[in-house]
Amino acid sequence: ILNNSEKTTANNKKLQINLALNYGSRNEIVNAINLIKKKKVSLTLRNIEKNLYTSNIPDPDLLIRTGNTHRLSNFLLWQAAYSEIFFVKKLWPDFTVSDYYKILNNFRNLKRNFGAL
């Protein structure tokens, strides 16, 4: 299924969806730091970012967390620093296209400040 989905959407340009299977952000960060140590380069924000699993994709602008849980659960802890996060009470199987469009509409109307006050 995943290989077929990847082939089918390979030329799509407008929306990027990333699936994280058996993924843990804390392990990813430790792995990045160990790679930096092995390369004997400075431990900088940029070098950490370059050694994350997600180094070849942009940080998410928007995260949607379903299931009435207000936490990231070890998901993209580094990359989500300036993401807008929407928490939805519904469980994933009950999340609808209408729910998605409501969130997108709210997201479009946000003034993003990327950490600035």
Name every feature range the model reports, one short phrase each.
Residues 1-117:
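Flexible, compositionally biased loop and terminal segments
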